[in-house]
Regions:
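Sec-dependent signal peptide recognition
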Residues: 1-7
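Hydrophobic h-region of N-terminal signal peptides that target proteins for export
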Residues: 7-16
Length: 140
């Protein structure tokens, strides 16, 4: 009986960990991503280094977009993950605001900077037991 009680008592902790996993994954990804940009190493130019953070289908799409002559393709005006052409010095201060989910993904709302005036929603999916970014949408 004590073992059943212990398992029952610890089950909320496991559930809580699963609830927060997408937010933690989005936070880690954005911290890493901004650090790469600060070092002038845009990850989209070397997408294989994003395997720990970005969904495999998204990495394949990035490779396709950046293959060949960019003059033959429509290229995005803004970075596809931070949804901006440039970033402020304080964007390494990243805050997860909240999350919600739908049939497609878990959306994690992330704010950049002290004022939190740049907000994106990262669409995360679970891939081989890990939460990974599929796409990002500019919120404000």
């Amino acid at each position: 009986k004590p073992l059943y009680f212990l398992l029952f008592a610890l089950s909320p902790l496991a559930a809580a960990e699963n609830i927060y996993a997408p937010g933690q994954a989005a936070l880690k990804f954005n911290q890493w991503y901004i650090a790469q940009l600060d070092q002038n190493k845009p990850p989209v130019l070397n997408p294989d280094i994003m395997n720990d953070y970005v969904a495999s289908g998204t990495i394949a799409a990035i490779k396709e977009m950046y293959s060949g002559d960019s003059n033959d393709k429509d290229m995005p005006d803004a970075d596809m993950f931070i949804k901006a052409q440039d970033w402020d010095d304080d964007w390494n201060q990243i805050t997860v605001l909240h999350s919600d989910f739908d049939a497609v993904c878990t959306n994690v709302y992330v704010a950049f900077g002290k004022k939190q005036d740049h907000v994106i929603a990262d669409c995360l999916v679970e891939e081989q037991g890990k939460w990974k970014v599929r796409s990002a949408t500019l919120i404000k």
